């Protein structure tokens, strides 16, 4: 398995460092949606007759904090990107913010977006787009991305043919 990082993903040195320190294969490639997914190089034993990119099955969007996502909520481009992910089986929004929902309600973010509106908007995204929203420390982001990709791969190998 090789993690695919979008070429426009910024400030992800901590994630790349995690991959390198744990000898996780990765490559940079333009992704239409999301910041991360994965690919499987050709492997006849696993049933992959060619390189296979899981871009139709998985989208992982990463935000560097609540301030960034609060700014994106009002951006039509962000809404359009979420809409394009609707048919993917697995969609994740990973936010580097330990306090999560509590930090939203208590307005612990760098944006003047109303906390109740912010809280409601994220829950609307969860329901409308089937999005899994996870809050985690920056230091755990690489592990989370790898774990999600590995879990999706296991599901497809064990339960479905690509």
Task: Please report, for each region that a protein language model flagged, where it lies by residue.
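Non-catalytic C-terminal interaction segments of nucleic acid-processing enzymes
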Residues: 1-55, 67-162
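Conserved catalytic cores of phosphodiester-cleaving nucleases, focusing on short active-site segments
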Residues: 58-64
């Amino acid at each position: 398995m090789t993690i695919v990082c979008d070429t426009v993903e910024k400030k992800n040195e901590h994630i790349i460092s995690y991959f390198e320190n744990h000898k996780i294969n990765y490559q940079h490639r333009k992704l239409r949606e999301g910041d991360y997914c994965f690919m499987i190089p050709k492997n006849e034993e696993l049933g992959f007759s060619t390189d296979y990119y899981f871009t139709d099955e998985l989208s992982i969007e990463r935000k560097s904090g609540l301030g960034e996502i609060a700014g994106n909520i009002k951006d039509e481009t962000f809404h359009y990107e979420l809409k394009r992910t609707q048919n993917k089986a697995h969609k994740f929004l990973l936010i580097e913010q330990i306090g999560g929902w509590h930090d939203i309600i208590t307005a612990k973010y760098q944006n003047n977006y109303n906390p109740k509106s912010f809280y409601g908007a994220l829950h609307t995204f969860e329901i409308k787009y089937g999005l899994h929203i996870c809050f985690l420390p920056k230091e755990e982001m690489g592990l989370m991305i790898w774990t999600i990709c590995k879990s999706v791969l296991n599901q497809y190998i064990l339960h479905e043919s690509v």
